[in-house]
A protein has these predicted regions:
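Hot-dog-fold acyl-thioester-processing enzymes
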Residues: 1-86
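HotDog/MaoC-like acyl-thioester-processing domains
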Residues: 1-7, 88, 93-149
């Protein structure tokens, strides 16, 4: 059964704050095989003009996944999480994320469409610091596979 189009525009406000730490950044950089000194060495980051180590551009996937899960688990939407796959992801950064950031995320369902028996959800998230300043906007396409015939 197709997802309800009336969910287009639904917003999911922040429910917690994500604390960005040096170790989290280092682990993520190591996981993606990026040895950039700006991700590992506080002195190198400061010399480049940053307050602390910065995160790789895709680091925000870590907190964005929690937002996607919040939508997927919304009982009113009725999405079958076991049938969902991540289609694509894009980031529009206002500034680099750095150790010491406290981030909050507001998620919105931008579009829902059905095609070839599958549902496609376009989800955006605004990631802000605790002062409300925009840090990054993300966009994800989620695909909910239809039932096999």
């Amino acid at each position: 059964m197709p997802l309800d189009q009336s969910f287009i525009g639904r917003t999911y406000p922040p429910t917690s704050t994500y604390s960005v730490g040096r170790e989290k950044i280092r682990e993520f950089a190591d996981a993606i095989g990026d040895g950039n000194a700006l991700y590992h060495d506080p002195e190198a980051a400061r010399a480049a003009g940053y307050p602390d180590v910065i995160a790789p551009p895709t680091f925000l996937t870590v907190i964005n996944l929690a937002a996607i899960n919040k939508i997927a688990e919304d009982p009113e939407l009725g999405m079958d999480y076991s049938r969902m796959v991540h289609g694509d992801q894009s980031f529009q950064h206002v500034r680099p994320v750095h150790a010491g950031d406290e981030l909050r995320l507001t998620t919105r369902i931008e579009d829902i469409m059905a095609r070839a028996g599958n549902d496609f959800l376009t989800v955006t998230a605004e990631i802000t610091d605790t002062d409300g300043a925009l840090v990054c906007t993300t966009r994800a396409q989620l695909v909910v596979r239809g039932e096999a015939a």
